[in-house]
Amino acid sequence: MARKGNPISVRLDLNRSSDSSWFSDYYYGKSVYQDVNLRSYFGSIRPPTRLTFGFRLGRCIILHFPKRTFIHFFLPRRPRRLKRGKKSRPGKEKARWWEFGKVGPIGCLHSNDDTEEERNEVGGRGAGKRVESIRLDDREKQNEIRIWPKKKQGYGYHDRSPSIKKNLSKSLRVSGAFKHPKYAGVLNDIAFLIENDDSFRKTKLFKFFFPKKSRSDGPTSHLLKRTPPAVRPSLNYSVMQYYLNTKNQMHFDPLVVLNHFVAPGVAEPSTMGGANRQGRSNELRIRSRIAFFVESSTSEKKSLAEDKKGLPHFIRQENDLRFAGRTKTTISLFPFFGATFFFPRDGVGVYKHLFFEDAREQLLGQLRIKCWKLMGKDKVMELIEKFIDLGGIGELIKGIEIMIEIILRNRRIPYGYNSYLNEVKKMRSLLSNRTKTNTIIESVKIKSVYQSASPIAQDISFQPRNKRRSFRSIFSQIVKDIPLVMKKGVEGIRICCSGRSKGAEIARTECGKYGKTSRNVFNQKIDYAPAEVSTRYGILGVKVWISYSK
């Protein structure tokens, strides 16, 4: 009897199988290379270090399709062990981990012993040094204008914004945007207004930027990051981006405007000599550049393509957090002309039931920013009206409401969140061009992880990858957290993990459940999600079932 051989259908099974419909089967190497690069890039956008704040990229789910790529971020909260309680240093105030707020560049400081301290050294151990004045020139000590408070200024972290201050007026004085003594009057006027003007503190505008949560110690106890945009230039990109995307195109090149707007003599006062001789010329130059900025922003001669050419460089210069660490800095756009941009964006979002005229008059009458005198109030008001009329009220309101909704929803971390959105928008265009696909980057904010099966499966799959942990230890930790964070409506959770767990020689399947779970009832509401994790011992599979109440 002849030996029975393998049938031809078995030997030719690979050739006779139907073509795969999965995109990753044909471009697996390219997809893996792309995913690794994407994950490394997203993790390096703003990594938190010992001295700086940032966001941790906990999870990054990338889904590839023939014409689309979906990227989902999961940004976890800071671990509890890193949160400091009341045990803080006596010279420093407690700062929250999400305090991304950035003020203007501080530049070079001079201490009492006539030694120059660079800005990068402010946040070190010598942060408590007594800084009394900003010196213009060694030969003109008699012309020093003291705008820094005498008591010690505790800086929260290296190369970042100052910590929480108990007095907003003193917090305003550390803003590098007003470091030139010519603008000390502007600084003192705003501080005096907030301290002494009760009517200003009752306005909706004040409540918007200084919510009650940040005013626990009184009307003048605020976070520095809550200061108005005229002092805190952290939302420049949002404003610029909105105006570049309106239908009635308000054409201007932010890069050209920024370069022509800042006077070189004002950019670094510590290295400038002969301030009295240049005072009048700088004022004229600033006045002319404000006029140039407004006229260029209200003209219809340029094309939108020309505006977009200078936008990436402007984004990097104005919104990159590392830009604040440079020694040679530039005066921000907002201290001089910021109220004009500040009003059209916030005038609709804050004063929803008021007209533009009332909002403008309240803003100008209450803030009383002296920088308006550089051009004259009438001229500025005329240009504002021209600016608004050109854009169209309908489109302006629509764009402003969208922007205000984003800001209001995340106003606890005003600068950090917008900086993250800027990076995501830039990455969206970059990936679309590199991969030639329609790349969509989405940020997912989940209040409770234990309400959906997919986040749990992803969370479990990442733990064995980083370190050798057994399934029992992972499941026991989840069981401890479930009673605290489980939402109402969830009856139980079942988790199964298959593979060489913890490097075992023989693969096995381990399961665990919490609560009531049933996979055999047809009318049971169940959420199911699988996940795979590649380890040095092979591939581990994770399956999660969540049962919901009827």
UniProtKB/Swiss-Prot annotation:
Region (Disordered), start-end ranges: 112-133
PROSITE patterns recorded: RIBOSOMAL_S3
Annotated Pfam families: Ribosomal_S3_C
Tagged with keyword Ribosomal protein: yes
InterPro entries named among the record's database cross-references: KH_sf_prok-type, Ribosomal_S3_C_sf, Ribosomal_uS3_C, Ribosomal_uS3_CS, Ribosomal_uS3m_plant
Cell compartment(s), UniProt: Mitochondrion
Family from the record: Belongs to the universal ribosomal protein uS3 family.
PANTHER family on file: RIBOSOMAL PROTEIN S3, MITOCHONDRIAL (PTHR35928), SMALL RIBOSOMAL SUBUNIT PROTEIN US3M (PTHR35928:SF2)
Protein name: Small ribosomal subunit protein uS3m
Name of the gene encoding the protein in the UniProt record: RPS3
